[in-house]
Amino acid sequence: PDKLPTGSYFADWALPQARAAIGARYGETIVKTTLDPALQAKAEKILNDFIARDGKVLNITQGALVAMRKDGRVVAMVGGRDYGASQFNRADGARQPGSSFKLFVYLAALQSGMTTTSPILDTPVQVSGYTPKNHEGKYRDREIPLISAFAASSNVAAVRLAHDLGPAKVIKVARQLGVTEKIPDDLTMALGTGSMSLTRLTAAYASIAAGEYPIVPHALDTFQKPKTTAYDPKVLAGMRDLLRSATHRGTGLEAAIDGAYGKTGTTQDYHDAPFVGYVGDLVVGVWVGNDDNSSMNGVVGGGEPAKIWKAFMLSALGRSAAPAVVEDPLDDLGLPLEGEIGPDGLPVTPLTVPADPLPPPPVAPVAPI
């Protein structure tokens, strides 16, 4: 812990917390923060190095990175490439999470009694005029286990789950994990069409590492932990299996290091690309995009963000860049062999069947924001 630094994204984020903790006092007051200067320096350098190297080709002009311990202690926060040029904190600003929102969808499914091997159709679907599509419009055209759908980030599977559960159940899970931002009360939310901060999203993933929720991201050592609820052991084990499948068999292979659990995120027209995950008690979220919301050149969460995440995680953990032990070929999960899977979708069989019309999802009251 250090004195609260000035002129940084972390300082701007921490200052309101410090003022609230100190109260009405006069004179200089020193507060101990959770910031780790060494990890902060690594985060700044790695994020900037990647964007400086690849940004022009990929049309990436901005990025953010937040690292926290599984109890919510924020140890590094990079809200942009240059604080002097722009004080807007992109780690705390709201952007679309894309497929990384599927954490909440699959948690709701597991809490409802489904398991990682429960079948879900990976076929085209249409609900009340809404027709979601997998990446590049390719599908398995059959039932696949939940773990396969999650690893491959099947969009139609996520929408089918949200339809069967009802949007209210998914929203309830997100609220329980600390998401306060507005979430669309329709099936589009299954694909992360709402907006939330990278810090809030990362804290939700931290709850899986911690085994309890909610995890509140905080900047001060004096933070009083709120009452938490432990996950059901079966639900927790299932969610961890899903996250591991993404990093070791699926769209998150670029982030594959031993002990990694995470999920890619990609939004429509490549406006936002996050990757969020953890190793041990270190939970990290990365986002790349543009302030003007212009499209990047095909950047997906399993690409540049996953590479930045891996580079930072290896540096933070003091590991070499030795390749991780990737799981057995994907076809034992009903997925293509390694190397054939694409970003946030299933690049296998082209569309061969018409969309399956479904009735409207069950309606339930949604708690107000």
What are these regions (language model features)?
Residues P1-P37, A41, R73, R175, ...:
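Non-catalytic, structured segments within soluble enzyme domains
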Residues L333-I369:
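Proline/serine/threonine-rich low-complexity "mucin-like" segments in extracytoplasmic/periplasmic regions
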Residues T131-K138, G166-Y205:
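Mid-domain, small-residue-enriched loop/turn segments at the edges of structured enzyme/sensor domains
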Residues T33-K56, L65-A67, M77, D82-G93, ...:
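A penicillin-recognizing enzyme superfamily signal
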Residues L58-G63, G84-F104, S112, T116-D122, ...:
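Short active-site loop at a secondary-structure junction
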